[in-house]
């Protein structure tokens, strides 16, 4: 079977290297150079970005991509946002955040990652929906055996979503610039 490294919209030209501890690290370009959409960052004088560095490994015959441990050193404080209940919608309140969500027997959920952008799970399908902000690129879907864990990194111009401890990854360079609210 062929497996995509990243199920998101803008993953391009990944490069890997081995660090001094023997870890295989991947960094990709977050942006497609010949795409027919534009990003508001162009008005600010820049276009595209690099993904979060990902440590590559193999677990149970599957390629795993997890954010490097060093990112934990950048955290400033923990905030408990909510307890997730069946049928509840989670709405993230900031433009810049790292969210870690663990699920027990999740059958269905919806998260609003930012205004107009949702992540949903139903019938074993995880869907990232950009809505009107996708510039014609509206959804990405991935079939999962089950949803147990999400780790989401968001800043004012991108989202990176690590599913089930790196079994799947989705990223998106934003077609909108979010103000921290």
PLM feature spans:
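Beta-rich accessory regions
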Residues: 5-181
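Active-site neighborhood of glycoside hydrolase catalytic domains
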Residues: 1
């Amino acid at each position: 079977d062929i497996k995509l490294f990243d199920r998101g919209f803008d993953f391009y030209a990944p490069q890997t290297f081995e660090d001094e501890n023997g870890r295989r690290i991947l960094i990709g370009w977050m942006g497609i150079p010949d795409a027919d959409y534009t990003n508001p960052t162009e008005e600010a004088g820049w276009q595209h970005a690099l993904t979060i560095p990902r440590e590559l490994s193999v677990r149970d015959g599957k390629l795993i991509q997890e954010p490097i441990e060093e990112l934990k050193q950048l955290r400033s404080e923990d905030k408990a946002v909510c307890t997730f209940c069946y049928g509840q919608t989670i709405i993230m309140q900031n433009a810049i955040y790292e969210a870690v969500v663990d699920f027990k027997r999740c059958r269905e959920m919806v998260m609003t990652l930012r205004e107009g952008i949702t992540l949903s799970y139903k019938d074993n399908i995880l869907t990232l929906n950009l809505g009107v902000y996708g510039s014609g690129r509206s959804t990405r879907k991935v079939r999962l055996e089950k949803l147990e864990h999400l780790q989401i990194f968001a800043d004012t111009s991108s989202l990176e979503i690590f599913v089930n401890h790196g079994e799947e990854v989705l990223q998106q360079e934003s077609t909108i610039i979010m103000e921290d609210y």
